[in-house]
Amino acid sequence: MKHWFFLIILFFMNCSWGQDPFDKTQRNRSQFDNAQTVMEQTEIISSDVPNNLCGADENRQAAEIPLNALKLVGVVISKDKAFALLQDQGLQVYSVLEGVDVAQEGYIVEKINQNNVQFMRKLGEQCDSSEWKKLSF
């Protein structure tokens, strides 16, 4: 019986041994690096999106979906980067960074705040005017 007790104690000690999550010297990656990796894996690359005269990116996120059909479902903000989570009507989630081309109309993500995301689209033949839209929770 004594041996079982020591084996159980040894087992629990072995299971509880690990890195201290509050020790900054043991950290080598942040949780946002992992989120960036996931975001890069889910990025939609579409070469058949028609080019906009105002410099729309051919790697547009949610290229077939109009902006008014997208819903803001989350925002992740860290020290050096921020990205927004947009959901379409088919419940697919797109993660977009600031400066990324989004939606069918070619809006660019200008600013990601805690409660909203601002989009801008260039208009006109010489792209001299702009249209602003905001999605919020």
From Swiss-Prot:
Claim: Repeat is one of the keywords in the record: no
Transmembrane segments: none
Keywords: Competence
Function: Involved in transformation (genetic competence for DNA uptake).
Origin: domain of life: Bacteria
Entry annotated with the keyword Protein transport: no
Source organism (scientific name): Haemophilus influenzae (strain ATCC 51907 / DSM 11121 / KW20 / Rd)
Protein name per the record: Competence protein D
One of the GO biological process terms: establishment of competence for transformation
One Pfam family linked to the record: PilP
